[in-house]
Amino acid sequence: MAGLGLGSAVPVWLAEDDLGCIICQGLLDWPATLPCGHSFCRHCLEALWGARDARRWACPTCRQGAAQQPHLRKNTLLQDLADKYRRAAREIQAGSDPAHCPCPGSSSLSSAAARPRRRPELQRVAVEKSITEVAQELTELVEHLVDIVRSLQNQRPLSESGPDNELSILGKAFSSGVDLSMASPKLVTSDTAAGKIRDILHDLEEIQEKLQESVTWKEAPEAQMQGELLEAPSSSSCPLPDQSHPALRRASRFAQWAIHPTFNLKSLSCSLEVSKDSRTVTVSHRPQPYRWSCERFSTSQVLCSQALSSGKHYWEVDTRNCSHWAVGVASWEMSRDQVLGRTMDSCCVEWKGTSQLSAWHMVKETVLGSDRPGVVGIWLNLEEGKLAFYSVDNQEKLLYECTISASSPLYPAFWLYGLHPGNYLIIKQVKV
């Protein structure tokens, strides 16, 4: 099979983050891919694991570990891409014409740069037009998929062999280019074919709605868009934090035991930042130059300053602006290279980007479902040795309850996904 010639090269837009290492925040250098699929600079991994002096070699991204240190091999494909990116970035920064200083393997970049450049305004119009056209095509494709799912839904009850075949057809349709990441985090949990079809239809309708909103927004005049943004909150189904207006709910029945924890800076990971009031923790865009301390977490975690050793305590955490998170409690002696819930002296509920809510207690995971709580209430009753987690968005719903030992003080504990800069958790003011 003949390969593509140089004239058939496909231009691909890459940002530095696409080929970056989350440990050093730079381009990959001698990239090594772990068994979980995540890649890092080899020397960054070795330095990180060496500093931790840990018994398990965990991935800094997904936290999967192994009993023995994995053999690090060079990912030559990633290395080649990173090298090409470096060369292109140097050419752009120097402002030189690549046609006069060709670089091996960068002929497609050189030929593109050697062409006469369009005026910026013409480039912008062409890009906006292509974005609108693509959005319209995606909208039509999703409408077609919605029709397919609805027709399946209206058919007679499926036979035992039917659901797998028909759902596999839908899977092939999705693989043609529709990105389900635009839909709300929702796991297909129904056991019946009808339930699965209903869930797929729900996700498709959400994608359809957002695509239509995107096309409408692109076609609106710029002045009109600015006026609407100033005069009214966004109509998007994913409003910004300061634009959201959650339904009013009654005061929590635990309000009389409410506390207002603040983050402890000594335990704060270098990949996190804390607000001035010490009640908001954010994933940083770059490693922070905090002073080294044996009390500081090597993973993106933080404890609060308040030690809870007796009595009853309640606090709430707003998780709506974080895609992956865990909230719970831990002892101060928790190992700083371990992850919340994976130790005997910590417990938490955790939301994964795979649309799964889990509880971790005594190093065991309990899957709770696929509904994502926007606000989590934590109830710690040390008099009875109980810990409970509630979803308290609009009404109170128990998520998980377990027994705990009060042999040592416990501290509110938090984990955030370190690969999503800008994600944050807020310790809320409990409604009294």
From Swiss-Prot:
Pfam families the UniProt entry points to: SPRY (PF00622), zf-C3HC4_4 (PF15227)
PROSITE patterns: B302_SPRY, ZF_RING_1, ZF_RING_2
EC number: 2.3.2.27
Catalytic activity of the protein: S-ubiquitinyl-[E2 ubiquitin-conjugating enzyme]-L-cysteine + [acceptor protein]-L-lysine = [E2 ubiquitin-conjugating enzyme]-L-cysteine + N(6)-ubiquitinyl-[acceptor protein]-L-lysine
RING-type zinc finger segments: 21-63
Bias (Low complexity): 102-114
Residues forming coiled coils: 121-156, 191-216
B30.2/SPRY domain: residues covered: 241-432
Residue span of region Disordered: 95-121
Keywords: Coiled coil, Cytoplasm, Immunity, Innate immunity, Metal-binding, Transferase, Ubl conjugation pathway, Zinc, Zinc-finger
Effect of residue 24 to A: Loss of function in RIG-I signaling pathway
UniProt subcellular location: Cytoplasm; Cytoplasm, Stress granule
Tissue: Expressed in skeletal muscle, spleen, kidney, placenta, prostate, stomach, thyroid and tongue. Also weakly expressed in heart, thymus, liver and lung.
Keyword Ribonucleoprotein included in the entry's annotation: no
Posttranslational mods: (Microbial infection) Cleaved and inactivated by hepatitis C virus NS3/NS4A.
One annotated GO biological process: regulation of innate immune response
Molecular-function GO term, any one: identical protein binding
GO CC terms: cytoplasm; cytoplasmic stress granule; cytosol; ribonucleoprotein complex
EC category name: transferase
SUPFAM superfamilies in alphabetical order: Concanavalin A-like lectins/glucanases, RING/U-box
InterPro entries found in the cross-reference section: B30.2/SPRY, B30.2/SPRY_sf, Butyrophylin_SPRY, ConA-like_dom_sf, E3_ubiq-ligase_TRIM/RNF, PRY, RNF135_SPRY_PRY_dom, SPRY_dom
Record remark: domains: The B30.2/SPRY domain mediates the interaction with the substrate RIGI.
Assembly behavior: Homodimer. Interacts (homodimer) with RIGI (double-stranded RNA-bound oligomeric form); involved in both RIGI ubiquitination, oligomerization into filaments associated with viral RNAs and the bridging of these filaments. Interacts with UBE2D3 and UBE2N; E2 ubiquitin ligases involved in RNF135-mediated ubiquitination of RIGI and activation of the RIG-I signaling pathway. Interacts with PCBP2.
Full protein name: E3 ubiquitin-protein ligase RNF135
Species for this entry: Homo sapiens (Human)
Gene designation per UniProt: RNF135
